[in-house]
Amino acid sequence: VLVDSAGASGGAHAVVKEVFSEIGTLDLWRVAIPPGKPLAYGSAPRPDGGYCLLFGLPGNPVSSYVTFELFVRPVLRRLRGEDPFGGRLRTAATLTGPVRKSAGRRAFIRVRLEEDGDQPGRWLAHLAGRQGSHVLSALALADGLAIIPEDTPGAEAGAEVEVIRLDVEIA
């Protein structure tokens, strides 16, 4: 497995698409998620007759982290013989603030989780800060990624969302 970070953007210095196409095949170039739209995936032949999986992650640090969690980590788990989606716990939570996004793209919003004092066993999801793909502070504060479905323009405070826990990994 070869993982490149910062070479899959759409800018002038993004060489991953060209290189992956030269050494093997490029099977995927973009995904409809913020953060993380530029994502390259392909494979290249190895000298022993096998193949090497190629991943090109976006250049913005938050985008790179999110695409790694969603696309690369499950592949690495599968290659180790583990359940590809068993590594991260998912939980339901209630948003404490509104989220706006473009319709047509599933969004992964950095949130801080807090147990709901009024309802034991329930979680509240607070926005971890500004949500730009370059804002590392929100990622550093986050312990979850709230999933906002692609068919909505966002979610209001009080909406129930699914959250991928970043603070807990299960076997």
Each language-model region and where it sits:
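Flexible glycine/proline-rich
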Residues: 19-171
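N-terminal small/polar loop signature for handling phosphorylated ligands or for N-terminal nucleophile
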Residues: 1-22
